[in-house]
Amino acid sequence: MNMIRIWGGGIYEDDYFYELCDRHGIMVWQDFMFACAMYPGDPEFLENVKQEAVDNVIRLRNHPCIALWCGNNEIDAAWRGWGWKREYTQQQQERIFKAYTDVFHRLLPEVIEKYTDGDDYWPSSPMSGPEIGDHEIRPANRGDNHYWGVWHEKHKFEEYEKNIGRFISEHGFQSFPEFETVRQYTLPEDYDIESEIMSAHQRSGIGNLRIREYMGWYYQVPEDFGQMLYMSQVLQARAMRIAMETHRRHMPYCMGSLVWQLNDCWPVASWSTTDYYHNWKAAQYALREACKPVILAPQLTADSLKLWVVNDLPTPLAGTYTLEIKGFDGKLHQTRQGKYKIKANEAAPIAASSIAGLLQDNSHRETMAVITIRQGKKIVDRQNVYFALPKELLLRQPDIQIQISEEQGKKYLTATTDRLACDVMFYLPGVKAVFTDNYKDLLPGHPFRTEIRTPLSKEEIEQQIRCRWVGK
């Protein structure tokens, strides 16, 4: 991940935040603090806006992390298409829009021009261009766009492939926090996502409905409360991984993908990928993998599997790939191998196979592809591909064995399984713990290893460690 957007509905961050971004090479898309509302245009207000903008531009302008100044979040799109104009007469509309243009097309760009050395300014996100009237367009062949077909318009995850923009500056999907976070604001009698307390911590009017709808399309919907929280994160991770891999496959046409949202300001069901207590959700682990400099990005259609490699490195990459067709019990049905070459900063297909040829006589409901790309002996990336929706897979009860070890003061978990277990989440009930990797598919013959950062001793971890998996 190499860019973060400071949203116009939040705050200007403190100096230390930008210093960290400078140090770690994280570009910042900096909104001015305006979002989803029309603002006054009287002289006193405009002077207030000017002084706030000048203060923050002078404070932040020398940070190399600042990649773009953006006037506001979604106001151009909202005034154009959210029905706000219906509340006003034509004369009122003209006065309101003049105030808008005074702030975002005159005042703020003048501040940027005067107080920076040519920094880029974008009036509103999303827009198709920098001029008045350059509204967001579909298909988004210029400017930036916010894609909410998945979620608001109930598009399936597969629709990401049909909705590619040049720079997708906002897209996302909701999930609940993990059970340990939810326990901080609930009692056992509240353990229902529709309970009064849980509803108070779900500020989207369609949030629970959307989660249930999408989960029913892709997974079995659990009745257990804890499993429901967990499965919502698995669902969110699936959406965000598909989105990011799809956007990256379409480089250089698409060269930006920003996920709404990274964090929460209170413990709540939301689109965040880390919760209020900084616990990583499944989506954060998935996005870390999907945002690596070099990734496998398989593209599965009704009749074919195409292997893509995305290389964001400034140097070309060459190596070998292996495609193994396996049963969920680990039995190897066939192996295909080959070589690949990818140019610097390129996304390209390296191989394609028919589904019929891969499956042969094996059931699509209990067969998978394990694809690995290597550079020499080094594994660059590995991906699992399933030939049916998760709810259609024949997932039988796995026997997951867990070992805890301690090496040089660090504690590690190693897990093995006798058959496929999907999206396995390890956790310590009631204990604050950080797992450096989690929510992974466990396969026979492929031990999973992760570091556990917790004050608990090795023996205490052995007694308390638990796990969840899809279908449990």
Regions found by a protein language model. Give the residues of each.
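Structural beta-strand segments of beta-rich domains
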Residues: 303-306, 409-413
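Active-site neighborhood of glycoside hydrolase catalytic domains
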Residues: 23, 39-132, 238, 277-278
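Asparagine-centered strand-capping/turn motif at beta-strand->loop junctions
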Residues: 309-313, 414-419
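Terminal connector regions
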Residues: 349, 354-398, 455-472
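Active-site-adjacent substrate/metal-binding segments within catalytic domains
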Residues: 1-37, 45-68, 199, 204-237
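Substrate-binding clefts and catalytic carboxylate motifs of secreted carbohydrate-active enzymes
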Residues: 69, 76, 103, 110-113, ...
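Intrinsically disordered, low-complexity Pro/Gly/Ser/Thr-rich segments with frequent PxxP/GP/PP motifs
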Residues: 324-363, 431-458
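Short, hydrophobic/aromatic beta-strand segments
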Residues: 317-322, 422-428
